[in-house]
């Protein structure tokens, strides 16, 4: 995948999206909704992380400035097809806040958190994939760090994004993976 094209797609959406002030309660409400949907069987594993995220949310400014506008909503590599050297995006998804930040979060779900590796059940060179993803993630991080909203809100959006997957996790391995990734984010 030519990551440059995906970055350009997101950046064009940022540039065409007006910076809009939203109430932090929109994010807090989504967090509470996600928290309530966590499988009771796994809930105890996530209590500390949930508490830390809630503290972080409560400390945020009441008004949050984000670009609101075009957003794919689920821009993971599994929703990107390459045909005749052109990128085709599939499986668009509504987001709780239509912001290009969500697309950065979803890209980094793959590059930083290696989500799509969980979906591969064939033999592959995981070490090589991890090296490539680390390179791509660094590129994405460096590129979007120029935006205040990215530096300010990426972590909390990524935490909510990963928590959102937990209710769908049936496998203990996936639950532990998500727990570890959330712990890493909490340390930043």
Predicted regions and their residues:
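An alpha-helical support segment within catalytic cores of ATP-dependent transferases
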Residues: 14-70, 145-146
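Regulatory N- and C-terminal appendages and interdomain linkers associated
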Residues: 44-48, 87, 153-157, 163-188
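Short amphipathic alpha-helical segments and their helix-coil junctions
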Residues: 85-95, 137-149, 184-187
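Acidic carboxylate-rich catalytic motifs and surrounding loops in phosphoryl-/glycosyl-chemistry enzymes
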Residues: 20-26, 150-159
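Active-site activation/catalytic loop segments of kinase-like enzymes and analogous catalytic loops
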Residues: 102-144, 159-174
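Active-site acidic catalytic loop and adjacent metal/ATP-binding pocket
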Residues: 55-102
């Amino acid at each position: 995948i030519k990551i440059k094209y995906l970055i350009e797609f997101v950046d064009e959406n940022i540039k065409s999206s007006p910076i809009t002030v939203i109430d932090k309660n929109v994010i807090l409400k989504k967090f509470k909704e996600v928290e309530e949907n966590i499988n009771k069987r796994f809930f105890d594993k996530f209590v500390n992380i949930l508490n830390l995220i809630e503290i972080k949310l409560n400390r945020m400014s009441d008004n949050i400035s984000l670009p609101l506008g075009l957003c794919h909503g689920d821009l993971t590599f599994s929703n990107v097809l390459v045909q005749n050297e052109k990128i085709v995006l599939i499986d668009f998804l509504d987001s709780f806040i239509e912001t290009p930040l969500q697309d950065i979060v979803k890209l980094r779900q793959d590059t930083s958190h290696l989500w799509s590796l969980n979906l591969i059940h064939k033999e592959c060179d995981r070490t090589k994939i991890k090296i490539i993803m680390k390179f791509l993630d660094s590129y994405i991080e460096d590129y979007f760090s120029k935006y205040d909203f990215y530096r300010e809100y990426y972590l909390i959006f990524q935490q909510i994004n990963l928590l959102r997957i937990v209710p769908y996790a049936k496998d203990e391995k996936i639950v532990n993976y998500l727990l570890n990734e959330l712990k890493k984010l909490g340390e930043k």
